[in-house]
Design a protein with these regions (language model features):
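Start-of-repeat signature of ankyrin repeats
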Residues: 26, 59, 92, 125, ...
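N-terminal segments that cap or nucleate solenoid repeat domains
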Residues: 23-65
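Ankyrin repeat A-helix N-terminal signature
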Residues: 32-36, 65-71, 98-104, 131-137, ...
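Conserved ankyrin/ankyrin-like repeat signature
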Residues: 41, 73-74, 106-107, 139-140, ...
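Leucine-rich solenoid repeat scaffolds
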Residues: 487-529
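Ankyrin repeat boundary signal
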Residues: 54-55, 85-88, 118-121, 151-155, ...
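Bacterial N-terminal signal peptides that target proteins for export
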Residues: 1-10
Length: 532
């Protein structure tokens, strides 16, 4: 009797196991059929007892897969068989969100009719309307709003709305549709970006036009003070910059980079302002020009629209870095490493520093003062002669600006009235250590000089010729010598240009300039000056 009961139990267990196996097999076949978009196989699996809401281990149901595959017929078949339109994966991804992301209004309609929630959210807080806005299908956007989707809902992580997402992707038709149904054009993300600023940052021309037509502020700025105009410029979107100016952007709008004019001058010749970490993330360096408007053309447009050609770069200076041998950059723009502050520098000064004679000529055409120095008394001629030259980062032979171009800038600065023997003026202070000692290191009291705010304190009372030695561009040295540069001029430390050629500690590296030394020695001998 016991053996008979045992046999019956085993048989029953086997039958139950077989039934479960058959059902699981049918479920697997259903999912496989949906993924391969085989409608006949889908119907057969359902007939064989497959669970219509069968799901993968991550909770993705057959209906979700059908929506992902954009297959309306299979979606219809599954819904007809009783599939739950609201079933979500373990990541809270729903069939509606997937269909909206695909921009499939027909499937979205089926799902909504079957009970899907127009305001359901993913695990990240993204709504179906946000997904549709990213895709850009205006019909899907309209449908969701008409069926109750909240148009101004923001996802919780970055605070972005559907309009921000549509604008950033350049989905102009979706932008128009959202605006038609009351999307807030002035909403801000947690990072301080509006739909308009997202569109500008991503160079979405049609979205920009649509947003401006619906009340976006063309002079809007981020929380750090970056204007839409400057955002366009520092991303290389000069065509967008021109568009914004045509739409009424203020060419003199306040900006932490000094001005839009300063920014476009840097973008025209950025040098290589990238340290190792930045290069690892962006080996191509600064943004390249996009569109058919050049930096020079945009600079002209800025000036024609009334940009102040003599505006000065003013920002809170921080101390000189003894460890790096550099002074601080202005905020929100990477100008590379340098020895002298940009504080007080005009657009003309910066163009001269970049060796950019065409830009210098344009600025003078619009009444720029070609002689205004920075706060440390560094003149445009000194800047052009490369007094603040950081090899490999300042615009120069290694970063796209030839020595001939820089020489042209030097000649132009001199022709426009700069004093060839003017000296920098960092104020009065004492540096401890003999001149020869300070060629190889900083003054012994350097720690007391870090807050002075002008740059490397050893650069006080330098001339343009001192600068030409630092860059080791010998044609510039020769030009200055030929045009009356004082050969035995001494800076505050006591260095003459010739003394510097013997070897100079800059940015934690020791450099010698033998070719330049030869030019200076010969010239000094001709003038009867003592040669060290």
């Amino acid at each position: 009797m016991f053996k008979t009961s045992l046999r019956l139990s085993v048989v029953t267990l086997l039958m139950l196991t077989s039934a479960v196996f058959a059902a699981n097999l049918a479920d697997t076949r259903l999912l496989d059929a949906v993924k391969s978009e085989n409608l006949t196989a889908v119907k057969k699996a359902l007939e064989q007892g497959a669970k219509v809401d069968a799901a993968d281990p991550d909770g993705s149901t057959a209906l979700l897969w059908a929506a992902q595959r954009n297959n309306d017929e299979i979606v219809a078949a599954l819904l007809a068989a009783g599939a739950k339109a609201t079933a979500a994966s373990r990541f809270n991804m729903t069939p509606l969100a997937v269909a909206a992301s695909n921009g499939n209004a027909k499937i979205v309609t089926r799902l909504l009719d079957a009970g899907a929630d127009a305001n359901s959210v993913s695990k990240e807080g993204e709504t179906a309307l946000m997904s549709a806005s990213l895709n850009g299908d205006a019909a899907t956007v309209k449908l969701l709003i008409q069926r109750g989707a909240k148009v101004n809902e923001a996802e919780p992580y970055k605070g972005q709305t559907a309009l921000m997402l549509a604008a950033g992707e350049g989905n102009a038709k979706a932008v128009e549709m959202l605006l038609e149904f009351g999307a807030d054009v002035k909403a801000k993300s947690k990072g301080g970006y509006s739909p308009f600023l997202f569109a500008v940052r991503n160079r979405q021309t049609e979205a920009i036009k649509a947003l401006l037509a619906h009340g976006a502020n063309v002079n809007e700025a981020t929380t750090d003070g970056s204007s839409a105009l400057s955002i366009a410029i520092v991303n290389g979107y000069f065509d967008i910059g021109a568009l914004l100016l045509d739409k009424g952007a203020d060419p003199n709008v306040a900006d932490p980079r000094g001005s839009a004019l300063h920014a476009v001058i840097w973008m025209r010749r950025p040098g290589a302002p990238w340290e190792a970490a930045a290069l690892a993330e962006d080996p191509e360096g600064p943004p390249k020009q996009s569109g058919n408007v050049t930096a020079l053309e945009l600079a002209r447009k800025l000036l024609e629209k009334g940009a102040n050609p003599n505006v000065k770069w003013e920002f809170k200076e921080q101390r000189f870095s003894k460890s790096l041998g550099t002074t601080r950059n202005p905020p929100n723009i990477n100008l590379g490493r340098h020895y002298i502050t940009f504080n007080g520098s005009t657009p003309f000064y910066n163009a001269a520093r970049n060796g950019d004679a065409p830009m210098m000529k344009l600025l003078v055409e619009f009444k720029a003062d070609p002689k205004t120095p920075n706060v440390g008394g560094v003149t445009p001629l000194m800047a052009a002669a490369a007094l603040d030259y950081y090899e490999g980062e300042t615009p120069g032979p290694y970063t796209g600006v030839s020595e001939a171009e820089r020489l042209e800038a030097v000649k132009l600065a001199l022709a426009l009235g700069n004093d060839i023997n003017a000296r920098t003026n960092f104020g009065e202070y004492q540096m401890l250590g003999a001149p020869e000692f300070q060629l190889k290191t900083y003054p012994t009291n350097m720690d007391q000089l870090l807050d002075m705010g002008y740059g490397d304190p050893r650069f006080n009372m330098m001339t343009a010729l001192h600068g030409a030695v630092i860059s080791n561009q010998q044609s510039i040295v020769q030009f200055l010598v030929d045009n009356g540069a004082k050969l035995d001029a001494k800076n505050q430390v006591g260095w003459t240009p010739l003394m510097m050629t013997k070897g100079l500690f800059l940015a934690n590296a020791f450099k010698e300039f033998p070719g330049t030394a030869k030019i200076l020695r010969e010239a000094m001998i001709k003038q009867g000056l003592p040669v060290e």
